[in-house]
């Protein structure tokens, strides 16, 4: 019965998307929905299957193909995203995120203010992570192959929060750190793309890294991934001033991070 209700709900949601596309004035679109319509590419189920298969092969052969990784996430993640939506709607904090649709990039976050926060706060740790790893929140690709705007936003949210998860877990952006974070995200979100990145990313580890991965990182990542509360309903932007070390000790959302040494490289 629950499965039938969920399928009916998804059908109604897709019908609503089509009505918005044809007669947008009847249901005013918010800023994210308007942006999503500019980038959205409608595809058939068969095209979705082909894109999913092709992007998975391309991503395995070359993990630097971020466009293929993004395509893989969108063409294989719809079922997991519906479950994430249910989780978000069951949480007060998640409901606020769905209403506000916050974005994480340099035009929406006051990074100058975050730099002035005490070094033990989440906001300061996030800025330090970006600088230390030479990454920017502006590099995420727009969602193109998800029709429902709610699911498209959740995929966008997942992408934009990825570096925040790195920060919380104290993981660098090298292959070893990425694989560990992907395991945590996979077990927390059930997104097929995350499982793929975790499994096939580990294959590309160097022998020394693989030993560390099997001995320390993999058990740690699986334990954290299973024990953490859902990460998607976390309104990270309202936690910039939170003490990161205290949060890791007291919150089931932020568990103690694995100690990283230079030899892990």
Swiss-Prot record:
Pathways involved: Cofactor biosynthesis; ubiquinone biosynthesis
Uppermost EC category: lyase
Top-level division of the source organism's lineage: Eukaryota
Keyword line: Lyase, Membrane, Metal-binding, Mitochondrion, Mitochondrion inner membrane, Ubiquinone biosynthesis, Zinc
UniProt membrane topology term: Peripheral membrane protein
Swiss-Prot/TrEMBL catalytic activity: a 4-hydroxy-3-methoxy-5-(all-trans-polyprenyl)benzoate + H(+) = a 2-methoxy-6-(all-trans-polyprenyl)phenol + CO2
GO biological process terms on file: ubiquinone biosynthetic process
Cellular component GO terms, alphabetical: extrinsic component of mitochondrial inner membrane
Pfam family, one: Coq4
Cofactor(s) this protein cannot do without: Zn(2+)
Enzyme Commission number, as recorded: 4.1.1.130
Positions bound to Zn(2+): 162-163, 166, 178
Chief place where the protein resides: mitochondrion
Alphabetized InterPro entries for the sequence: Coq4 (IPR007715), Coq4_euk (IPR027540)
Family assignment from sequence similarity: Belongs to the COQ4 family.
Complex formation: Component of a multi-subunit COQ enzyme complex.
Matches recorded under PANTHER family: UBIQUINONE BIOSYNTHESIS PROTEIN, UBIQUINONE BIOSYNTHESIS PROTEIN COQ4 HOMOLOG, MITOCHONDRIAL
Function: Lyase that catalyzes the C1-decarboxylation of 4-hydroxy-3-methoxy-5-(all-trans-polyprenyl)benzoic acid into 2-methoxy-6-(all-trans-polyprenyl)phenol during ubiquinone biosynthesis.
Comment field (misc): This protein may be expected to contain an N-terminal transit peptide but none has been predicted.
Protein's recorded name: Ubiquinone biosynthesis protein COQ4 homolog, mitochondrial
